[in-house]
Amino acid sequence: MKHSATAQPHATPIRRGGIPVPLLALAGGLLASYLPMIMPSLAGISFLGWMLPLAIAVIHLLMYVGRMKFPLMLWAPWIAWVAGYTLLADAHNALQRGIMLLTPLIVAAAFSTLRPTADLLNRIDRWIKIFLWVFLAAAGIATGLLSSGVLYDTTNFAAGSITASLLACWFATRYVLMRQWRDLLLWLIMAAVPVLANTRTGMVAVALTLPLVLAPWSVLRRALLLAALPVVGLALFQTERIQKKMFYSGRGTVDDAMTAVYNMFTGEDHVEADFATSGRSVLNMALRRGLDDAYFFGHGANTTEAISLRITRVAHPHNDWLRLRYEYGLIGTLLFAATMLIQTWHGWRAARRVPSPINIHLYVGVSAFLPMAIFMLSDNVILYVAWFGNLQFALLGLGYAIAHQVRMAEMRMDAS
């Protein structure tokens, strides 16, 4: 995808070799997250996945805050809510968790200060394709496909499925805007990643990225694809590998699975012992029992960690919505959900005013809120900022910078 300049190609601030440093930091963070899967000896650098983009974004933003185009004020109530809870928190690691929740917003603000040139946009498009190969190599090793030639029944690539959903949003949007079959093929490859990784929520989240993409696309095509997905899903459900993942006995029906999932997420009834929940149902019930004790305002930042460690020996409950509800209360959860919806609407409106294909960054950013909301039901996507949030909000921030540049160019044309 070759971009043409939409305004004068001003030099981008804080640069090294013509590349904005926030972009280098984001790329470094992605590599720090995925290279250890390919080369385990690099496991010690994984913490840079979220810290490097954050540190550079803060420095960059302090220097160029006057150029910020990202609508940070939309998120101001949520930022204040998290900051207040973090300052008052008694739980261990509350400060780190609070910072991680807000990191994507800082990254978005920093990227929105950049002056997008055609060279920069083409470079980002090219780098995403390069990262795709790193990602696929990590996926191949983590799932056993490249390391042993046989797919593992269980994998440690749940976070990879989260990244796959964001890449799927990129290629889905690119396909819808550009009509290139290569992008559709790459989307199909992304849709296959959670199948290979055997991550149940990931299969649903990634599959929905194309039919529910927020870029303009035929309603008929969306409907046909949505109609085909249950057929594909049913076929996958019957495979031995997924049956083993779903049921301890290795065999169950769709009705068994749907009933168990509904009961696990709503807490209305017990979950059948044969349904494999990876400990989620027990932890979810423990957290739900405490919701009424702090119904509106929650128990405080990161108070779920101690409960999760006691029950599952894992630091985070694999349900971000329940986590928010327990820690930040009903008001905090509704505040986050409402802000996410407002940001989606605001970004979608901005994307409609930008010519294609340079509106791809905004469309991808807002389309990614759907898989994010789905993953929040069974994972920690709001904390896995290195795997999802940083890149999503970087694209949003850059999209707003492009929208501002287009608007300024139109104003100059009207004035002349």
Predicted regions and their residues:
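A membrane-periplasm/extracellular boundary helix in multi-pass inner-membrane enzymes
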Residues: L196, W217-V271, R288-D293
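Long extracytoplasmic/lumenal interhelical loops at the membrane interface
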Residues: H270-Y328, W348-R352
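Transmembrane alpha-helices of multi-pass inner-membrane enzymes
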Residues: V364-F375, N380-S416
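Helix-loop-helix junctions and helix-breaking kinks within/between transmembrane helices
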Residues: I38-F47, A91-R97, Y152-G160, D183-R222, ...
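Hydrophobic transmembrane alpha-helices and their immediate junctions
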Residues: E327-A373, A409
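Transmembrane signal-anchor hairpin modules in multi-pass inner-membrane enzymes, especially those
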Residues: M1-G84, T113-N122, R126, R174-W181, ...
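Aromatic-anchored transmembrane helix interface
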Residues: G49-P53, L72-L114, W127-L132, F157-I162
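Alpha-helical transmembrane segments of multi-pass inner-membrane proteins
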Residues: P116-S147, T154-W217
